[in-house]
Curated annotation (Swiss-Prot):
Disulfide bonds join 56-145. The gene is SODCC.5. This is Superoxide dismutase [Cu-Zn] 2. It catalyses: 2 superoxide + 2 H(+) = H2O2 + O2. GO terms for biological process: removal of superoxide radicals. Keywords: Antioxidant, Copper, Cytoplasm, Disulfide bond, Metal-binding, Oxidoreductase, Zinc. Pfam families: Sod_Cu (PF00080). InterPro entries: SOD-like_Cu/Zn_dom_sf, SOD_Cu/Zn_/chaperone, SOD_Cu/Zn_BS, SOD_Cu_Zn_dom. Binds 1 copper ion per subunit. Binds 1 zinc ion per subunit. SUPFAM superfamilies: Cu,Zn superoxide dismutase-like. Its EC number is 1.15.1.1. It comes from Solanum lycopersicum. Homodimer.
Length: 152
């Protein structure tokens, strides 16, 4: 069993912990607890770079090793890092579990060392018709992020 963690920080008062686990070649399970967000849907993605020197802006684009267009987690055509939306309750917190086969913790396409990002707005899953739908899901600004690191 491989385990990883990302601790989310932001200048906007958002904080949280995202745990990743993968058993062999099985899909990766993502368990998250985040607080300080506005209620509603927020885009949630793995971004290509584990660089936070300029805050969440330096994490690069969505992780996309296959060079595909943006989509929903269940779509065949999607970025590997497209994990859809998280739902934030009226109290500003989100607790969620995602299982995904395109974000391995080992091998050449591992997400270790990359970043996880929470966006300000809902991800339209590539179906919104906006000019940014097919690249970012038109999910708005990056309000919290953390680097995915191996856990002992």
């Amino acid at each position: 069993m491989v385990k990883a963690v990302a601790v989310l920080n932001s200048s906007e008062g958002v904080s949280g912990t995202i745990l990743f686990t993968q058993d062999g070649a099985a899909p990766t399970t993502v368990n998250g607890n985040i607080s300080g967000l506005k209620p509603g849907l927020h885009g949630f993605h793995v971004h290509a770079l584990g660089d936070t020197t300029n805050g969440c802006m330096s994490t690069g684009p969505h992780y996309n090793p296959a060079g595909k267009e943006h989509g929903a987690p269940e779509d065949e055509v999607r970025h590997a890092g497209d994990l859809g939306n998280i739902t934030v309750g009226e109290d500003g917190t989100a607790s969620f579990t995602i299982t995904d086969k395109q974000i391995p913790l080992t091998g050449p396409q591992s997400i270790i060392g990359r970043a996880v990002v929470v966006h300000a707005d809902p991800d339209d899953l590539g179906k919104g018709g906006h000019e940014l739908s097919k690249s970012t899901g038109n999910a708005g600004g990056r309000i919290a992020c953390g680097i995915i690191g191996l856990q002992g």
